[in-house]
Amino acid sequence: MIRRWLTISKSGKKKKAVNDTITEEVEKVDFKPVNHDINDELCYSESSDNPSSSLFVSNLDTKETFLNEDNNLQISSGLDYSSETCNQGSNYSQDGIFYISNAKAINAYGGIITQGPEAPILAMKVSDSMPYGDGSNKVFGYENFGNTCYCNSVLQCLYNLSSLRENILQFPKKSRESDQPRKKEMRGKKPRIFTEASFEKSIAGTNGHLPNPKPQSVDDGKPTPVNSVNSNTAGPSEKKSKFFKSFSAKHVQDNNKKEGSPAILTTGKPSSRPQDAPPLIVETPNEPGAPSRLSFENVTDRPPDVPRKIIVGRVLNYENPSRGSSNSNNLDLKGESNSSLSTPLDKKDTRRSSSSSQISPEHRKKSALIRGPVLNIDHSLNGSDKATLYSSLRDIFECITENTYLTGVVSPSSFVDVLKRENVLFNTTMHQDAHEFFNFLLNELSEYIERENKKIAASDINSDSEPSKSKNFISDLFQGTLTNQIKCLTCDNITSRDEPFLDFPIEVQGDEETDIQEILKSYHQREMLNGSNKFYCDECCGLQEAERLVGLKQLPDTLTLHLKRFKYSEKQNCNIKLFNNIHYPLTLNVCSSINSKVCQKYELAGIVVHMGGGPQHGHYVSLCKHEKFGWLLFDDETVEAVKEETVLEFTGESPNMATAYVLFYKAMYSNAVEKNDRENMAKEQDDNIDNLIKYDDWLRTCNSGQKKKEELPIADDLDTAIDDSFVSNTPIKSSKKKSRMFSFRKS
């Protein structure tokens, strides 16, 4: 493969004299390593007149055309070349200029050069501290280890907050001496391969019912239980199945009337697994037949929702991968390995099955794991330092950002292990609370940043360099301030106390409906302190009647609202879930009644949804507003697109048992978006999703062909070894991995 470091030069003619030759004014742009690893020989155009030129470059803020008078793309270089280009008939020169002859108009989109006016799917922010981009074009699901949906839903919301993601990727700043190679793939210390054939054997032993595997890991060839749990529920599965009818029946009826517009998050009667659905199991390439972790909720517990566009978990017409290969988690798509491709957007998306929208969620989850790539983050990537929640979260973000592909599944086993080590409350088989996890995680991240800032400040004092300004971006992004004022009604003395908060609670009272906009448009809380609850006044030196006023003093950049739906019931002697209607808007105006200057407009950026009839059992999913792809539904391993109106349906209205639990609002600093602009934006986001899928399939095709080519010498060596074994009559062991059924427990 050819690697080239590129520097673009924009040509402009400038004549000094009549006989002078034309000189070039060069405008240099800094480039970082590209985001994909593609072999030039494996992606080519059918015609040399129309080369497949897709130069992935970075750090371009505006859309420009880089063509000289001969209609050639001109790229000058003073050092090494490092381009990720699929082209044909190109001339490479270390010292000269790189041309693509007879090329079409080639446009640069903030980090990408592609033919035609296609959307900039591969464009990302790139800097010295983010050499592989900011991860804004990546869409990954998270593997569920039995009851980790509470963790997955929150992590998805945090990743899709661009300001938080970028800060985590850049802090603490890595020294040049500790420069680590790019994480193009993440197999982990104990690689796992998800295959179809091994799952068929497991199905045969379960009388056709989908199994629910017991999470295990492999250590020295012996299966050992991993510190994960079996289920996210605390009761029988028949109790769980009721709450999956939470998605309103109205959604089904409305969408049945319109052909071609299937419902999102809707359910009727739970259906069983389709007979033709390909099963799945996991094999470990290092140890034949050794079981590994894999968790799915029971099929009857999942809603047969019909999404519009599936991004992760797409069911394609595929061939079985090589059983003996341990180099990839990806399937080889039929008809792609030998096909002639131009740019990915030039090829129509004919690989998605027309009936994929009818596939069950369980089938999509399996397809997501089979298709991969599965980023198996089973150990700390932080070197010799002890793993923390911050370093583990950064490992996840880095692996997603630096991965070759645009979509896939993350297996955050190391993060979950660290979480259970740091807080024993999460090291149980009980149903966990997503808000408690979010609050604990933010505090841990904030404390880590404070410790690192102290280390940096101490090193600056010992060195001759100027001390750097320490800041805590968790506090900057999430922390607001409440002011608590108590006025003595006897002497009118006012006592004030400020209270910081990372998330703002929304109380649920009785059977009343709650409108979040009405509460926060002029927020204040008044309470009379009298009777047995009198206030001790320092001025009066005694207990006095007083009035307490709570208001907003400072608003955060990201406002997190906790809808307090879980409450202890004395009558039932347990915690129950409240299904009061809580209405939340897409745009939220928050103002303080104490200080008129404290006012901010927010837009909804993410929701953690709890699906269930009580706090002891249920399932968490999240909906996040992606900056390029609009609203996406993240359900553990799978990701699918949803319409904006769907986001507002989780209010708790009966019989819907899927309710918004945690809301993320981002501050808006620009003018409001007009209705026409919203429609254009929605269309652009739909196009971006289509282009994302095409690009991702294209990248998989290129890399699939490359891996096949790399495996040819290995196969030749194996044939030679076999021939030698026949001559010497010495038996050799087969390299084929054997599968073995492992135990499952029903969720």
From Swiss-Prot:
- The USP domain covers which part of the protein? 140-668
Gene Ontology biological process terms from the UniProt entry: free ubiquitin chain depolymerization; protein deubiquitination; proteolysis; regulation of protein stability
Q: Which residues carry this modification: Phosphoserine?
A: S198
Q: Which residue windows does the record flag with biased composition (Basic and acidic residues)?
A: 174-183, 251-260
Q: Name one GO molecular function term.
A: cysteine-type deubiquitinase activity
Its domain of life reads Eukaryota
Where along the chain is the active site annotated? C149, H619
Q: Where is the composition biased (Polar residues)?
A: 225-235, 319-343
Q: Where is this region: Disordered?
A: 172-305, 318-367
Q: Which UniProt keywords apply?
A: Hydrolase, Phosphoprotein, Protease, Thiol protease, Ubl conjugation pathway
EC code(s) of this entry: 3.4.19.12
Cellular component GO terms, alphabetically? cytosol; nucleus
| SUPFAM superfamilies membership | Cysteine proteinases
- Which Pfam family is an annotated match for this chain, by its short name? UCH
Reactions listed under catalytic activity: Thiol-dependent hydrolysis of ester, thioester, amide, peptide and isopeptide bonds formed by the C-terminal Gly of ubiquitin (a 76-residue protein attached to proteins as an intracellular targeting signal)
Q: What miscellaneous comment appears in this entry?
A: Present with 125 molecules/cell in log phase SD medium.
Similarity comment text for this entry: Belongs to the peptidase C19 family.
Q: What is this protein called?
A: Ubiquitin carboxyl-terminal hydrolase 13
Q: Which organism is it from?
A: Saccharomyces cerevisiae (strain ATCC 204508 / S288c) (Baker's yeast)
